[in-house]
Amino acid sequence: MKKIAILTSGGDASTMNKCLSTFITYASKYNCEVVFVKNGYKGIYDNEFVKPDYTETKSWWSLPGTKIYSSRFPEILDEQVRKQMVDNLHKNSIDTLVVIGGDGSYKGARLLSKSGIKVIGLPGTIDNDIASTSYSIGFDTSLNAIVNSIKEIKSCMDSHANVAMIEIMGRHCIDLTVFAGIATEADIIITPESFYTPQQLLAKINEKRKTNSRGIIILYVELLLGTENIPTVEEYIKYIQANSKESVKKNILGYLQRGGNPTAMDMIRASLMTEHALKMISENQYNKIIGVDEFKVVSYDLETAINMKNPSRKDLIDKFFN
């Protein structure tokens, strides 16, 4: 039986708990024993290895956040700190370390792998900034939270014909901003790839007014405005209001984007990736990063499409119910 340690690292993401629940549920099927590491990489250093309670962990499947907690641990860059972490993993007879986190967490896993630790990575971050997967765990939940907030803001903007500038999380990844903009039919998005100066933004707003738009929704990605000689959002608003009759309202959604109840699709993807991690461990595959590839639009001839058969779900039934 292989003993695997699981930790959640970096920023919390809804559906991390679903991963933990799935690991507990299916570990025995793959002849694995699971222990949790509290507080991310710091927990390895502090020797916070805990044996999970099966019944309690099974109840976590729909809870947001991470019940084994997370932390930032830049000390992992120190060789002596890593040596202590490796020693603690060996003392606890850990065969494979599973890291649920983002890009920074993966870099930590790579450092430990170079010290001889077998690692598996699962993409857990709302930012969707991991190039090896189309969707990261928590992204869909965060996106839905953003969409719901925009809908509520839009109704207020429509009532008064105001402009809303809404900051969206994502660090240096624009996916939440772009996808939320598509979903809500936002009027304008501001990203490094679709950038507007205050003057250009006002011109764009004026264009929208010509189409009889009332409430105007502008989404901008965080960590852009106010950096590298770019005006702050307050300076954007000041310019627009000084040079027009527009009333502009600043909104920062902040942590509302991170703590929502997991969506069904997020939980399904988390389950699929977690089960695949267990399968890989049972097959002695390690130093791997798991992801999904789903961003593809296809088309078929009419006759071909009509004659196509719906896919069998037997593989899913076998994975999760047999």
Swiss-Prot record:
This is Probable ATP-dependent 6-phosphofructokinase. ATP binds at residues 11, 72-73, 102-105. NCBIfam families: PRK03202.1. Homotetramer. It is found in: Cytoplasm. Its EC number is 2.7.1.11. PANTHER family: ATP-DEPENDENT 6-PHOSPHOFRUCTOKINASE (PTHR13697:SF4), PHOSPHOFRUCTOKINASE (PTHR13697). GO terms for cellular component: 6-phosphofructokinase complex. It catalyses: beta-D-fructose 6-phosphate + ATP = beta-D-fructose 1,6-bisphosphate + ADP + H(+). Catalyzes the phosphorylation of D-fructose 6-phosphate to fructose 1,6-bisphosphate by ATP, the first committing step of glycolysis. It comes from Malacoplasma penetrans (strain HF-2). Substrate binds at residues 125-127, 169-171, 222, 249, 255-258. Keywords: ATP-binding, Cytoplasm, Glycolysis, Kinase, Magnesium, Metal-binding, Nucleotide-binding, Transferase.
